[in-house]
């Protein structure tokens, strides 16, 4: 389990659907990390194992996780698979997951709880749509997302 209190800041980079093996090699040759900061790289899932490093403050994170632990869910990654691959962080509730895959707060909450049960830190993404922003609903939307998405369990229990 990672002790987050040892870091002064946490930086998370979501590579989305970008990158390749050559990019990863070049990126890590140029990457310098501050020992007081935690840096998390979330590449496309096929590259997760290429990011395993010996840096004590550099971690790989998944861009999403399934609500299911196993079964006929083509293309999904379970929390157990993330554990097997020594993944310590996972994004949940990203705006693109909400927009393109109709992901709801309840799903984000379920994923977050599953991750915590497996000692993976959920990185809960919140944010309003452009339409919600234009209607001045930002505060209400963000408040509801925080209330609905924050897991019932604690990583620190």
Which residue stretches match the model-derived regions?
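Active-site loop-to-helix "anion-binding N-cap" substructures in soluble metabolic enzymes
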Residues: 1-157
